[in-house]
Amino acid sequence: MENELFLQKQNFLVLGLAKSGYAAASILHEKGINVVVNDQKAFEENEPAQRLAERGIEVICGEHPTSLFDQHHITILIKNPGIPYENIMVEEAQRRGIPVWTEIELAYYITNAKFIGITGSNGKTTTTTLIYEMLKADSIKTLIAGNIGTVASEVAYHADGDEWIVTELSSFQLMGTHAFRPEIGLILNVFDAHLDYHHSRENYEKAKQNVYLHQLESDTAIVNQSDETVVRLAESGKAGTVPFSVHQELSSGAFIKDGMLMFGDEAILPVDDIVLPGAHNLENILAAVAAAKTAGASNKAIQKVLTSFTGVKHRLQYVTAIQNRKFYNDSKATNILATSKALSAFKAPVILLAGGLDRGNGFDDLKPYMDNVKAVLTFGQTAPKIEKLGNELGIQHVKRVDNVEQAVSAAFALSNEGDVILLSPACASWDQFKTFEERGDMFIDAVHMLK
């Protein structure tokens, strides 16, 4: 009730009309709260803007007029997570001391449902999906939302108070939270990522820290005991902690002991019974078990999921085998760490397809994981850098191609029986694609064209 009264007193400016902006504007309007929308794309070409305008919402397109702040007495700006803080409207809001939200903050304000918030540099989507499936397998009322594709505010708006909203959270989304408080907060790991957006490791960590920062003593922080940064960030909050570790046996929480997945003194199941491929996924699984057990899931439900769940699309996804060559789609590998983990998952010879948006980093950190790589097909802005890496390692076949389709054809031509052909770009997709999903789908389509 207190949150509702707060919202009713505000005048909102929604900046950016991707899915999250459209949902935020729609919800605020439906609740009778003052809202105006601003989007860079021209109105004539902007279908979401046209739909909002038809409902009586004021939409200003094609420019970013700072006069809107005075004209509409704006008190809160909600921005699309991808819009940089250097945007003129964001800078104007900050200059005026106006809070800058993402729609995750709005989601928190409009529901009485409970949140499980999952973030980290890698593994978020897999872990989020695992937690959701584990709770669902136990008939616990559960919804899934956030960076995984379903807009959190939309889910929260229709959620009941006794439901869990399992929410994948990016650093972009978390940077725009100020009071958001998940009853269960989880940081999987923290590595250098998105420094072009956050400008420093410190800012990136601060964004991630928001998962823990506003928790109460009655809440739970799920903590990767093997990640010093996560342990340090967890100390900022008041919540009790439940640890997990893939590297050490613990007295509580989730860990591996004598080949068994444990939660405290409970043996959940043998690690060999888990069907999700890749040693790196054990960390995601342990985190998911810690969160699911905290939320009330039974061992039986967890066992059911872990003996049947084979992965999420675009995350080390097995596509098919053609002439005894196995194809894997790991398009979600948008950084070096994700690709190194993918390479570590295979003992067979690998033909690596990599490349994409150039964020200014090098690729030397991949070198320790390239022993099984017999060929590299590279594309996108980073192709020269990855080509150089392959040549430095003395890999026999290193070839630059124009796109993913050409990479698939060239990889198949170079392959032998028993090889793995792996799309794991180690780069964001935005130089050639709108999303990593689009890139992964192109890979899958190109693979099926080989049949």
Curated annotation (Swiss-Prot):
Binding site for ATP: G120, S121, N122, G123, K124, T125, T126
Keywords: ATP-binding, Cell cycle, Cell division, Cell shape, Cell wall biogenesis/degradation, Cytoplasm, Ligase, Nucleotide-binding, Peptidoglycan synthesis
Reactions catalysed, as given in the entry: UDP-N-acetyl-alpha-D-muramoyl-L-alanine + D-glutamate + ATP = UDP-N-acetyl-alpha-D-muramoyl-L-alanyl-D-glutamate + ADP + phosphate + H(+)
InterPro entries: Mur-like_cat_sf, Mur_ligase_C, Mur_ligase_C_dom_sf, Mur_ligase_cen, MurD
Subcellular location field: Cytoplasm
Family: Belongs to the MurCDEF family.
Physiological role: Cell wall formation. Catalyzes the addition of glutamate to the nucleotide precursor UDP-N-acetylmuramoyl-L-alanine (UMA).
Record protein name field: UDP-N-acetylmuramoylalanine--D-glutamate ligase
